[in-house]
Structures are given as C-alpha cells and as structure tokens.
Amino acid sequence: MRTVRLTKESTKDILENLLKRSPNNYGKFEAAVANILANVKEKGDEALFSYTKEFDKVEVIPETIRVTEAEIEEAYKAVDASLLEVIRKALVNIRSYHEKQRQNSWFTSTEKGTMLGQKVTPLNRVGVYVPGGKAVYPSSVLMNIVPAKVAGVPHIVMTTPPGKDGKVNPSTLVAAKEAGADEIYKVGGAQAIGALAYGTASIPKVDKIVGPGNIFVALAKKAVYGHVSIDSIAGPSEILVLADETANAHYVAADLLSQAEHDEMASAILITTSTELAQNVEKEIEGYLKVLSRKEIIEKSLENFGYILIAEDMDEAIEAANEIASEHMEIVTKNAFEVMMKVRNAGAIFIGEYSSEPLGDYFAGPNHVLPTNGTAKFFSALSVDDFIKKSSIVYYSRSALQEIHKDIIQFASSEQLTAHANSIAVRFEEEDKKEQP
C-alpha cells in the first residue's frame, strides 16, 4: 500500500491507475463475447445449451434449464435456519428503504382546458444476472430483485450458472424465492446475457438486464445495451475512507481490507489529515494480514490499487475524494455530517465509526449496486427508478389550443418544418380565414 502526499498531480496519477481496471480496457475479449451473442441470437437454445456444456460442464435441455419448485423446496431444506432468518431480516430493511423511492403518476389541469402529467409505468420484464462459481452472493440477489418488485415489475427472470452437479447454490435459490423472482434459469456467462437480450425458446426476452458478473458478462451487457436497457457496467469494488486524527486505526484498516478482499483489482484508499493515523493504519493492516483467509488477494489488491494519501487539511481531502468518486466512501472525522454535505461524488456514504461499509452490503437497506470507476460523478445506486419509465401526458381542449395555435405555427415555421405547422393550422382553417382582411 503506497503512502503519498496528496497533490493534484498525485490524484491524477491515482485516477489513471484506477481507470486501468475499466472493462473498456478488455478489448481482447470482445470478439469472443460478440461471437457468443451472435450465436445465441441466431441459434437460440441450441447455442445456449452448447455453451453451458462447454463452459459449465453441465448438460441442460428445455426440461431442466428452468429451476423447479421441487429444487427450490430442496434448497430451503439445505439452507441453515439462522441464515434464512438473516435473509428475511435484511429483506425487511431493503424493502422499507426502496419503498420510499416509489414515484407516483401526477396530473395537473387548468380552467382553460389543459391537462399535463407524467404517467409512471413499471418495466414489463426484467432479467437479473447472478454470478455462480465458488463465491456465492445471496445479498446481490436481494439487492437486484427487491427494487424491481417494489417498482411493480410483473415478470422477474433470474439466470445463474449451475454448479458441476447441475444445481444452483441453495442460498442463491432461497434468496431469489424470498425476494420474489418469478422464473430462475440455470445458465450463466455471456450466453445468459444473450438469451435475456434476444430471447430463446426457453428463456423470454426482457426489457432490462441488471446484476454483476465477470468480464464476459460485463462486455456482453455493454454489447446488448440499446437492444435492451442495462443497469451499468460494474467494475471492481472500491472503498475510500476520509479520516482525521479522531478515527480509530483498528477500524479503518479493517474497513479498507473488507473491500480489498473482493479481488486483485479492488481498490482501497485512505485520505487523511493525520500522519499518525496513516502510520497506525499501516501497522493494523500488517496485523490483519496474518489472520485473514484471503491474504494473497488482499496483498495483490493493496499492491496495485491501495493508497494512503496525506492531505494538508480536510478541504483538500474532500476535493480529492470528489475527484476520485469512489463506489463506497466512509467519513470518520469530527463534524462528519458537515463533511458529508461537501461530498458531491460517491456511490454510497457511510458516516461515523460504527457505519462500516459491510453494513450497507448486507443489511442497512440502501442498495449495494453502486457506480464504480469514477462513474459516481454522474451515476447513482440501483434504485426503483431503474425499473420504471415515465410517459409525458398532454391534453388540450379545442379552445385551449386555439388560444396559442398561432404561436406554435410561428415556432414550427421558423424551423422550416411546414408539416408541423400545418398539423396545427388545419384545425383552425375556418377561423383563421375569417380573420384575414
């Protein structure tokens, strides 16, 4: 982990290093992904089943690709009762938070005979991708499905790669059932994204695809964007801790490592005004590394994308934090809420020493699907808004349109769009003729 004096130049260098992790820098995989998508689009289930056999070493057929109720019942028996209780507790918090994001249609009218409004409609069908492999993330299942359910999406289709035994991890299935998935399919990778985007005989086409995945999934989502909507192109996990001399080095080090353990591309950054804290955090990290299970991954992550930045004052620290625009930000300072108000760019902000980032990953309620790679400057956390669309509503009575029709005709004529002007003019030809001298 590198300790650096904070300057505009050092901030720029760090940003350039972090952006190397972007999926945009994996062009060598794009041809393979494009080929998979093209085959799924053209051959449907045939390609889907073939890729599942090739990549996951599992044979699926139309009768086995969809998870059955019997398989879900079996999953409930396999999941520890205490974990099920925790999943249900987390669901209560996640639903409660997202219900506050609901938007209603609205309409406003005038005595002149006009009505304007906005009609809010949930998307019809959403695809949720859930990664498989050794790591299992039922929390991601909850975070991707719940806002769609709260938004009112009537059809939620989940795909996840099967294990070598042809089954889906029990905790993944239980989380999906609890959250409200309507259909679950045993297929993963770029081929699953293709199936959701284009539809096959077994898997229905969706309107939007959400959920994290490996580089092949990320590139596939990027490729189908426009044909369907997507949530984002997720990058490696990020944490930035903004701290002063009041922070507890033992806690700060633990929080930095909580994200560094995700993978070797994860970034962990401390920006502090205290050199003493910086030194103590380094010592604490060394101590933790002796006992943590994912030591090798953490060491690689910290070597490549770990930084301790020493700032002259808190204003300089905040400025750098806004420039980096981290996925997760913790504020452990005096007057932390005042500092929070100065933060413009962060996916999620955790305030105080007892608001550790994993609290947001699992339990607090806000969504843990967050913008990465500096995109927190213009993107937000996954929310109910991502699963609705808004239609503008316009109603004018004849008298209301007549009052302003000449203004519209003049505007359209100034743009030389005579058909636009005519569309208004034909409705008042008789009246306008009478007005002519």
Identify the function of each model-found stretch.
Residues 180-258, 262-267:
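Conserved NAD(P)+-binding/catalytic subdomain of aldehyde/semialdehyde dehydrogenases
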Residues 322-437:
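C-terminal core of ALDH-fold dehydrogenases
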Residues 108-174:
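Conserved small-residue-rich beta-alpha loop and adjacent elements
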Residues 262, 270-346:
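A glycine- and small/hydrophobic-rich beta-loop-beta segment
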Residues 143-154, 177-179, 197-203, 221-223, ...:
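Alpha-helix C-terminal capping segments
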Residues 1-124:
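N-terminal Rossmann-like NAD(P)+-binding subdomain of aldehyde/semialdehyde dehydrogenases
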Residues 154-164, 268-274, 281, 352:
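Short internal beta-strands
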